[in-house]
Regions:
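Cytosolic regulatory regions of ion transport systems
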Residues: 1-142
Length: 142
């Protein structure tokens, strides 16, 4: 696998972990043409922009219809439109958050001790992201 990201700090962090990652803009034709799209098994985009994800799914499916393409959408309409473009799965974070909480409740975590482990894990993750300068995961393009 290969991670493509527009944030140089993310690339540096991934490379330190020996995760193959390159800096780039997925809408850059030269970058896309340099990737072995005909050989990939799966592509995952966490970018919330509809047009970018539409470009990703259309480009990959044109070259490799069997590749699994997982994308992210902000709205129900965007998710449904990405499915029309042949996305295999579309993440909708707002709804996933609700599902996650429902699962926590169904696991009978009805007292403060049931949430202690989740809370500690979450606080650790938040501090790690804050230490990296991430207040919110949005990355603006120049």
């Amino acid at each position: 696998y290969l991670v493509v990201d527009f944030n140089p700090e993310t690339i540096a962090d991934l490379n330190k972990l020996k995760i193959p990652a390159i800096y780039g803009d997925v809408e850059d034709d030269a970058l896309i043409k340099s990737l072995p799209l005909d050989k990939i098994k799966m592509a995952i985009s966490t970018i919330p922009d509809f047009e970018t994800n539409k470009f990703i799914v259309e480009t990959i499916k044109r070259v490799n219809p069997k590749a699994i393409v997982i994308l992210r959408a902000h709205t129900i309409e965007d998710a449904l439109n990405l499915y029309k473009k042949k996305a295999d799965y579309v993440l909708t974070p707002y709804f996933l958050g609700g599902e996650y909480l429902a699962n926590m409740l169904s696991e009978e975590k009805t007292d403060e001790h049931g949430y202690k482990k989740e809370k500690e894990k979450h606080i650790k993750m938040l501090f790690e992201r804050l230490k990296k300068g991430q207040e919110h995961p949005d990355v603006e393009k120049n």
